[in-house]
Structure formats: structure tokens, C-alpha cells
From Swiss-Prot:
Organism: Streptomyces coelicolor (strain ATCC BAA-471 / A3(2) / M145)
Superkingdom of origin: Bacteria
Family matches, as PROSITE patterns: DPCK
GO cellular component terms given for this protein: cytoplasm
Gene: coaE
Top EC class, one word: transferase
Taxonomic placement: Bacteria, Bacillati, Actinomycetota, Actinomycetes, Kitasatosporales
Name used for this protein in its record: Dephospho-CoA kinase
Function per UniProt: Catalyzes the phosphorylation of the 3'-hydroxyl group of dephosphocoenzyme A to form coenzyme A.
Gene Ontology molecular function, alphabetical: ATP binding; dephospho-CoA kinase activity
Length: 200
């Protein structure tokens, strides 16, 4: 088994790269998706978030109001640390269970947005960083996710710098390119990962 850490700044196009890797046969463990699951209505995770931040972070249907919580934590590093302290241990536990269920020769790709920030690179056999220019990230966040420029810049500023991410990368996937070019690059990376999985 080859354990791959996949990361990249918000709006860099990490989801597209992970989707292409899954098409090739990777087992994907998506930390963002798991992070949503562990704070779904009725979970201990959501109860802990409400205990820390108050009932104002709940939507009318009892689910987590993500934009509301985001506006609180992304403007305050201490509050962000509190949220991460609740969610990250739950995500780790679920990720471990999914990895243990994968085949011995699998390429297991952990899609981890805050891999750099949390110093998680040593946990993986290989780190793949999806990279895009800050202007590209900003454009995608405003155009595709409907964020205001201020919100988008705050999210970007709360993450590691482009240089910090590239520093921990074993492989960099440049995503300032057209989709076809990205596909070709991901195919090259996949071939490298498969070779790695069979020599582990």
C-alpha cells in the first residue's frame, strides 16, 4: 500500500485532481467530506461544536450553518484552533478505519486540505501538492464558489503559503493549465504512484 497525502490551497483544484486519481483506481479518503460527516445532525461532533460556539451556528433544520461558523472561525485563529481540535481527531479516527479496509497493493490518497498547516507530511509515503497562482485561486473562489473577495482572501490567508506547501511536496501538480493538460499530468503522477505502491 502506498499512502499519499494530497493537498493544495483552497481553490487550487485539488478536488479535480483527486477525482482524476480515483478514475485511475486510487482509493480516496477525503478529509473534507469526512469532516462534514462527523458534524452531521445527531453526531457527538456537532454537539461539541454547538457547545463551543453556541446554537447560533445551527441552521433552522438543525444542521451546521457552515457559512456562519466559517465567518466566526476564519476571522479568529484561536476559534479556528478550537474547531480543529474538535473535528480533526474525529476525522483521523474515520480515515484510519477506511485505510485499514483498503487492499494491500492499493494507492490510498488522503485528500487533506490542511496537511501543511498541521505538519502531517511525515505520515505519508509521498506528498502531492496541487498548485495554482493566488490570482487563479481567488478567481475560482469568487466565480465558482460565490465568495466575496474579502471572504476568499481571508480563507487563503488562514492557510499555509504557496511556498510552504511546495517545500513539503514530493510531487507538484501545476493546475494553472487547461483540463486536458491537467489530465496528462495526473496520468504521469498516477504511473509514478503505482510503481511506488508495488515497491513498498
Amino acid at each position: 500500500m502506498l499512502r499519499v497525502g494530497l493537498t493544495g490551497g483552497i481553490g487550487a483544484g485539488k478536488s479535480e485532481v483527486s477525482r482524476l486519481l480515483v478514475e485511475h483506481g486510487a482509493v480516496l479518503i477525503d478529509a473534507d467530506r469526512i469532516a462534514r460527516e462527523v458534524v452531521a445532525p445527531g453526531t457527538p461532533g456537532l454537539a461539541a461544536v454547538v457547545a463551543a460556539f453556541g446554537e447560533d451556528v445551527l441552521a433552522e433544520d438543525g444542521s451546521l450553518d457552515r457559512p456562519k461558523l466559517g465567518s466566526i472561525v476564519f476571522a479568529d485563529p484561536e476559534k479556528l484552533a478550537v474547531l480543529n481540535g474538535i473535528v480533526h481527531p474525529l476525522v483521523r479516527e474515520r480515515s484510519t478505519a477506511l485505510e485499514e479496509a483498503a487492499a494491500e497493493d492499493a494507492v490510498v490518497v488522503h485528500d487533506v486540505p490542511l496537511l501543511t498547516e498541521n505538519g502531517l507530511a511525515p505520515l505519508y509515503d509521498l506528498v502531492v501538492v496541487v498548485d495554482a497562482a493566488p490570482a487563479t485561486q481567488l478567481d475560482r473562489l469568487m466565480r465558482l464558489r460565490g465568495m466575496t473577495e474579502q471572504d476568499a482572501r481571508a480563507r487563503m490567508a488562514a492557510q499555509a503559503t504557496r511556498e510552504q506547501r511546495r517545500e513539503i511536496a514530493d510531487v507538484v501538480v501545476d493546475n494553472d493549465v487547461p483540463l486536458e493538460e491537467l489530465r496528462r499530468r495526473v496520468e504521469e503522477v498516477w504511473d509514478e504512484l503505482v510503481r511506488g505502491a508495488h515497491t513498498e
